[in-house]
């Protein structure tokens, strides 16, 4: 599994003869998550967070995001979260997040490999078909402050030097995005 910006991705490599068991397990996991190993997994994420703090790529990305999007989640936290949140997590908040965002109208299943597509669709219907959609809260954030001049941030690290440049534009649907 991994997270990045606006996605959480779970990757599984399943033999064709175990597809039904996979659908059964995944439907249970997504519909009724039980966080038994929560603290063990949290330690792994926190260690990944700590390691990432020393990586030049992460440091430069964080500096660029903070500069370009200071009042947007991209600029206020990393994809791994904030250290203080990882130190003091709330299982209630995590369950609430799952309940709000892990809903069928906000999830996609992509499969490739040696299987019968019609049989897979039937399995998806069997195990996920009665899962009810819910409204997803709109993604809201504060308007970004205007950038009226070039901003340079210097980030120092242990790797070979490089230059990273970024521009803010009107959005993915704008003409500027095609440049």
Language-model region placement:
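M16/insulysin-pitrilysin zinc metalloprotease superfamily fold
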Residues: 12-42, 175-177
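Non-catalytic accessory/assembly modules
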Residues: 37-42, 55-64, 115, 122
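Bacterial peptidoglycan biogenesis and beta-lactam-recognition machinery
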Residues: 31-36, 116-118, 128-134
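Short, well-ordered alpha-helical packing segments
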Residues: 11, 23, 27, 46, ...
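Non-catalytic beta-strand/loop surface segments
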Residues: 1-18, 51-106, 130-174
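Non-catalytic, conformational "gating/processing" segments within enzyme and secreted inhibitor domains
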Residues: 42, 91-127
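Short amphipathic alpha-helical coiled-coil/interface segments
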Residues: 42-49
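A general alpha-helix detector
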Residues: 5-6, 24-26, 44, 106, ...
């Amino acid at each position: 599994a991994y997270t990045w910006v606006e996605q959480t991705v779970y990757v599984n490599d399943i033999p064709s003869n175990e597809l039904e068991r996979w659908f059964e397990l995944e439907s249970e996991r997504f519909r009724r998550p039980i966080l038994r190993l929560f603290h063990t997994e949290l330690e792994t994420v926190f260690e990944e967070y700590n390691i990432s703090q020393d990586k030049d790529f992460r440091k430069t990305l964080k500096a660029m995001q903070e500069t370009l999007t200071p009042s947007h989640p991209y600029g206020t936290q990393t994809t791994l979260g904030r250290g203080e949140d990882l130190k003091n997590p709330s299982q209630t908040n995590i369950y609430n997040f799952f309940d709000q965002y892990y809903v069928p109208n906000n999830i996609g299943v992509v499969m490739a490999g040696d299987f019968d597509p019609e049989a897979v669709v039937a399995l998806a219907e069997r195990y996920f078909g009665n899962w009810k959609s819910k409204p997803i809260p709109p993604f809201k954030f504060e308007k970004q402050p205007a950038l009226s001049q070039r901003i340079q941030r210097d980030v120092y690290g242990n790797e070979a030097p490089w230059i990273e440049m970024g521009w803010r534009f009107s959005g993915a649907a704008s003409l500027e995005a095609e440049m």
